[in-house]
């Protein structure tokens, strides 16, 4: 695979969407609002726990995992939400994983994928997602706004992912309430936790912010805790020998 990860992935997504049929809308799964929950739990750094079998940068992470049991452990140990990778080609995920997990937990679930079309959003909702991911770097601002409005119009929440100041300002302009700062550059897939620290100077009081990627330890979590409502962690949890203990380590009391 090319080192230009994002363009390669988006090219594949365009092919997938072209072959994708429109699904009839199914009822929205009932759970709490992630935005309201993160706002109300600001005294503790919250955890968005991810189910991820593989990635383009690391290759296979944990192919043997029981995805439902992993998700149940996340919920039992206090995760605010479960993120589920559904990309098949690059992350070895599947929409069925989202469907299975969403049917077995009561907390919000995020469809973690590269969404570029309304058809994907309907499929995500039908599979049990209550939140979808939109990546600023993957879309024009006009298209980002269209997909954001479409998703929220269906009762879904949206995690809008950014990586630099220009993208953060775009997320603010479209009215995003839940904003992620990805410490991973989606072109090179290199990570730097300083991305979160630098962008935190530009946050707005009425939004909630999630630091994503490059968080493996208590020390990493403590670095971002003063500025963020939550962290999104995948690899560290998927590789942990004791998932419950790892979650306990990453949940930081902000006083």
From Swiss-Prot:
Its EC number is 4.1.1.48. It comes from the Bacteria. SUPFAM superfamilies: Ribulose-phoshate binding barrel. InterPro entries: Aldolase_TIM, Indole-3-glycerol_P_synth, Indole-3-glycerol_P_synth_dom, Indole-3-GlycerolPSynthase_CS, RibuloseP-bd_barrel. Keywords: Amino-acid biosynthesis, Aromatic amino acid biosynthesis, Decarboxylase, Lyase, Tryptophan biosynthesis. Gene3D superfamilies: Aldolase class I. One of its GO terms (molecular function) is phosphoribosylanthranilate isomerase activity. One of its GO terms (biological process) is L-tryptophan biosynthetic process. It catalyses: 1-(2-carboxyphenylamino)-1-deoxy-D-ribulose 5-phosphate + H(+) = (1S,2R)-1-C-(indol-3-yl)glycerol 3-phosphate + CO2 + H2O. Pathway: Amino-acid biosynthesis; L-tryptophan biosynthesis; L-tryptophan from chorismate: step 4/5. NCBIfam families: PRK00278.1-3, PRK00278.2-4. Belongs to the TrpC family. PANTHER family: INDOLE-3-GLYCEROL-PHOSPHATE SYNTHASE (PTHR22854:SF2), TRYPTOPHAN BIOSYNTHESIS PROTEIN (PTHR22854). This is Indole-3-glycerol phosphate synthase.
């Amino acid at each position: 695979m090319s080192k230009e990860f994002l363009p390669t992935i988006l090219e594949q997504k365009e092919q997938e969407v072209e072959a994708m049929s429109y699904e009839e809308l199914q009822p929205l799964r009932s759970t709490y609002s992630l935005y309201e929950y993160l706002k109300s739990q600001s005294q503790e750094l919250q955890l968005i726990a991810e189910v991820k079998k593989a990635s383009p940068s690391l290759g296979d992470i944990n192919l043997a995992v029981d995805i439902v049991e992993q998700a149940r452990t996340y919920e039992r140990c206090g995760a605010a939400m479960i993120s589920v990778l559904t990309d098949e080609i690059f992350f070895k995920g599947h929409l069925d994983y989202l469907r299975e997990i969403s049917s077995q937990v009561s907390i919000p679930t995020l469809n973690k994928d590269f969404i570029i079309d309304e058809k994907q959003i309907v499929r995500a909702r039908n599979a049990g997602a209550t939140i979808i991911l939109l990546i600023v770097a993957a879309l024009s601002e006009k298209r980002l706004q269209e997909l954001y409005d479409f998703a929220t119009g269906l009762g879904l929440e949206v995690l809008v992912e950014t990586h630099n100041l220009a993208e953060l300002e775009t997320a603010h302009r479209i009215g995003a309430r839940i904003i992620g700062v990805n410490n991973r550059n989606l072109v090179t897939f290199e990570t730097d936790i300083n991305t979160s620290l630098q962008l935190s100077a530009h946050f707005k009081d009425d939004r909630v912010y999630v630091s994503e990627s490059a968080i493996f330890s208590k020390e990493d979590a403590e670095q971002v805790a003063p500025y963020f409502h939550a962290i999104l962690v995948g690899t560290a949890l998927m590789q942990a020998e004791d998932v419950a203990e790892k979650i306990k380590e990453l949940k930081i009391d902000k006083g």
